[in-house]
């Protein structure tokens, strides 16, 4: 199916089609044997090949003026400039394999993956990226984190577990690299933030859910008293692992100044900031600030009300944000180019984000299941608009931050790119396993609605700090406002106090006389109103994904298409539609 779960530095929202494909698509086949000492060995390996092509032309508002576009910045268009409609953007061979050992009440699991994208490794592109010096030819992934590279090997899960019978209770313990999934959310992120996302893995054709979630070094327990409706689970993570994002210059990247230090393209401040010698202002790359490894933990309690067939949950956790925040060091433009070395940008990961929540899961008449989740963070990091930061960082006095950083501010002053805000989210979802219909033997339908509220001012309020909105829209009505930049002369697109939207997914299963299962599916996402502080909701953004999958025994093949609403003005990825194919074998 398609590929994409709502979130990441402004592109995480396009991960959902991939995760749905991974979740509903993989045959459950495995090799099993038993050793002489009674140890059971279970292994599963999936070998696949997939390819993707660009389906739409690039939009001029997402390309810098130097290349014929009308964007407010030239720091976001490398992915667009490297690929035209119909171009091959990925051609990847993959192997994902896991082995589990079980004996009695103990066990261990190890999972790894390997991939080779021949298109990214060998195909010439016309523009390049900052890593290869913007030279036409092959892209370079030098300096990318391992998981974002064009080929590589990565260890995923690696943990040991034990199941223990205590005095009138059962205890399960797992220690090692593992994935946890808390809460009731299917598409949106709320309580399910214990495991970060590997975005490049999500985008690769034929992605499996095992590739999508990054295992974290964790000690986990689940305690279930006998004859009691209450259970308790908890975790402690001793290693910080951030999101993996698209490498600069690749098709899905919407920022040329990528999180990896190797993506060191200077951030153009725009023609409004000009030095005394007439040169244009730029920000150089600084060193990222990584979160500490310690201090991530959580506790949850569940109550199973059998009389009403409902489970309730209470959650509390303290995590470091895996989503990078853009921050800066100042340098007043009146000092001239000699002080440019002090003007820098960097990415950092805010620590100790507290989150609390309550959930409900129940079954309704007619075969429907219902899930609800209410989550709240009193100190969620919200990205301050980067363009407002640019103008303040050079002491221009422009924009809502200008007064806080006058031209007398010492060069090299740290400018934190986020504020801590209150953030609450309510989501409701439903799932139904479909009965035979339209010639199908059955199917699945899922719907989810989310409403988010944040403790921020309306962006149109005088003096309000503005959050979100990408580089492409340049300045704004409080600073410089060239009429050539669509969406610039407006307070739209900045994060709003409230936002809401929904997601739909449906799949039907057909059996044939030749033993081939055919599974057509459709995914639709619609962000109805507002822009959320975490980027999950972006007004007018719509995503449509359709696919058809064929399975016969251990073999499978799939064709898919994912498109976006090209009129969603403040969606930086609205022109990145694609279609793809993938084939695989599981043993």
Describe these PLM feature segments.
Residues 41-49, 106-112, 171-173, 230-234, ...:
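Transmembrane beta-strands of outer-membrane beta-barrel proteins
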Residues 102-258, 319, 501, 529, ...:
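Outer membrane beta-barrel
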Residues 88-92, 304, 311, 316-324, ...:
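Detector for outer-membrane/organellar transmembrane beta-barrel domains
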């Amino acid at each position: 199916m398609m590929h994409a779960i709502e979130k990441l530095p402004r592109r995480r929202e396009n991960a959902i089609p991939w995760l749905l494909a991974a979740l509903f698509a993989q045959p459950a086949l495995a090799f099993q044997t038993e050793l002489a000492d009674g140890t059971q060995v279970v292994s599963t390996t999936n070998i696949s090949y997939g390819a993707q092509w660009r389906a739409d032309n690039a939009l001029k508002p997402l390309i810098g003026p130097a290349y014929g576009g009308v964007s407010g910045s030239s720091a976001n268009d490398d992915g667009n400039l490297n690929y035209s409609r119909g171009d091959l953007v990925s051609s990847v061979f993959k192997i994902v394999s896991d082995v589990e050992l079980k004996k009695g009440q103990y066990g261990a699991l190890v999972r790894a993956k390997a991939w080779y994208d021949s298109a990214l490794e060998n195909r010439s592109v016309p523009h390049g990226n900052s890593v290869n010096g913007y030279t036409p030819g092959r892209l370079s992934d030098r300096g990318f984190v391992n998981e974002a590279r064009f080929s590589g090997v990565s260890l995923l899960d690696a943990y040991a577990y034990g199941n223990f019978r205590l005095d009138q209770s059962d205890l399960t313990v797992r220690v090692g690299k593992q994935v946890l999934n808390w809460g009731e959310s299917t598409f949106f992120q709320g309580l399910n933030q214990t495991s970060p996302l590997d975005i490049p893995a999500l985008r690769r054709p034929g992605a499996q859910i095992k590739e999508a979630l990054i295992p974290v070094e964790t000690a986990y327990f689940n305690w279930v008293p006998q004859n009691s409706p209450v259970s308790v689970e908890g975790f402690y993570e001793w290693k910080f692992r951030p999101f993996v994002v698209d490498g600069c210059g690749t098709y899905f990247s919407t920022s040329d100044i990528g999180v990896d230090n190797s993506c060191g393209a200077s951030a153009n401040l725009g023609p409004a900031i000009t030095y005394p010698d007439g040169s244009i202002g730029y920000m150089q790359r600084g060193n990222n600030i990584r979160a500490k490894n310690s201090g991530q933990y959580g506790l949850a309690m569940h109550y199973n009300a059998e009389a009403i067939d409902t489970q309730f949950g209470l959650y509390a956790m303290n995590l470091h944000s895996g989503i990078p925040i853009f921050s800066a060091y100042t340098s007043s433009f009146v000092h001239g180019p000699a002080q440019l070395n002090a003007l820098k940008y960097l990415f950092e990961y805010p620590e100790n984000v507290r989150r609390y929540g309550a959930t409900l899961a129940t079954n309704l008449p007619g075969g429907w299941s219902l899930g609800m989740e209410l989550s709240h963070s009193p100190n969620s990091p919200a990205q301050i608009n980067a363009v407002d930061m640019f103008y303040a960082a050079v002491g221009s006095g422009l924009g809502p931050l200008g007064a806080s950083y006058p031209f007398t501010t010492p060069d090299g002053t740290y400018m934190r790119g986020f504020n801590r805000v209150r953030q609450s989210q309510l989501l409701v979802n439903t799932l139904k396993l479909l009965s035979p219909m339209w010639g199908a033997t059955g199917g699945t339908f899922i719907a989810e609605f989310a409403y988010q509220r944040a403790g921020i001012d309306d962006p149109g309020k005088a003096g309000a700090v503005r959050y979100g909105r990408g580089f492409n829209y340049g300045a704004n009505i409080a600073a410089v406002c060239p009429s050539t930049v669509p969406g610039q002369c407006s307070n739209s697109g900045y994060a709003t106090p409230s936002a809401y939207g929904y997601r739909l997914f449906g799949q039907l299963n057909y059996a044939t006389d030749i033993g081939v299962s055919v599974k057509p599916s459709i995914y639709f996402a619609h962000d109805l109103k507002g822009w959320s502080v975490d980027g999950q909701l972006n007004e007018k953004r719509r995503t449509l994904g359709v696919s058809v999958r064929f399975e016969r025994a251990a073999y499978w093949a799939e064709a898919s298409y994912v498109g976006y609403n090209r009129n969603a003005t403040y969606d930086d990825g609205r022109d990145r539609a694609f279609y793809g194919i993938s084939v695989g074998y599981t043993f």
